[in-house]
């Protein structure tokens, strides 16, 4: 999902996760329509990784406890993780390549590690849909690329949930994201295959500025006036 600030991304996410009701139209998620199914049950199948969740986790929470909390939809557990919860949390940490960080407090995890742990939290909850709301915010270029490569590996696993990436940056769009929604001023500007949507023409319209999009090896780059571009 792409769009400038104020394009409607946050409002749409709030609708998708059941926290905001639209004034018109309908919302269908995972084959079920809000209003015709219990949204509380449907929301349990949707995971969200965002900066707001990161900020609510206390510094002394261990990575394994953060992950285990996904099973019970809670934050900042006061009890140790044991038994089947521990087994499931360790498996999820291994899947997000953070098994060696299980006993590390939240305060001592890097931003990239925190993002992986939160994805592990979503995996242990067995969400069918995982929304990543600007997951690379705050990461330096190296950490961002490492996180994106991890995300690409995760997307190819058999147990991976459906993924939605919300971003401002075309550099973060991986080949695994085959469909793209572009918003502009609260309306849908484009909805379809990523290769046809992430183009100079579409993004120039979305950001109301002349932009140049380049594509190489399945990845995208964005430039301003004067950069050579391909794909539209």
Segments and roles (model prediction):
Residues 201-232:
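ABC ATPase nucleotide-binding domains
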Residues 105-109:
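Conserved ABC ATPase signature
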Residues 83-101:
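Conserved ABC ATPase "signature" region
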Residues 130-134:
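Catalytic Walker B motif of ABC-type/P-loop ATPase nucleotide-binding domains
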Residues 25-35, 42:
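Conserved ABC transporter NBD signature motif
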Residues 2-4:
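The feature captures the beta-strand-to-loop junction immediately N-terminal to the Walker
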Residues 17:
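Helix-to-loop junction immediately C-terminal to a conserved catalytic motif
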């Amino acid at each position: 999902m792409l769009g400038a600030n104020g394009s409607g991304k946050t409002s749409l996410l709030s609708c998708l996760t059941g926290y905001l009701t639209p004034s018109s139209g309908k919302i269908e998620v995972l084959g079920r329509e809000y209003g015709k199914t219990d949204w509380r049950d449907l929301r349990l199948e949707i995971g969200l990784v965002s900066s707001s969740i990161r900020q609510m986790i206390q510094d002394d929470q261990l990575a394994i406890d953060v992950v285990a909390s996904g099973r019970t939809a809670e934050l900042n557990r006061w009890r140790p993780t044991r038994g089947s919860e521990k087994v499931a949390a360790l498996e999820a940490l291994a899947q997000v390549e953070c098994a060696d960080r299980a006993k590390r407090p939240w305060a001592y995890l890097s931003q990239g590690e925190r993002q992986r742990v939160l994805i592990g939290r979503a995996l242990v909850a067995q969400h069918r849909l995982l929304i990543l709301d600007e997951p690379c915010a705050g990461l330096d270029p190296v950490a961002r690329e490492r996180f994106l490569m991890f995300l690409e590996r995760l997307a190819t696993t058999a147990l991976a949930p459906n993924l939605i990436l919300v971003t401002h940056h075309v550099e973060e769009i991986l080949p695994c994201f085959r469909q793209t929604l572009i918003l502009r001023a609260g309306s849908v500007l484009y909805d379809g295959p990523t290769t046809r949507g992430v183009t100079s023409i579409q993004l120039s319209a979305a950001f109301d500025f002349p932009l140049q999009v380049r594509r190489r090896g399945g990845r995208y780059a964005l430039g301003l006036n004067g950069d050579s571009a391909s794909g539209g």
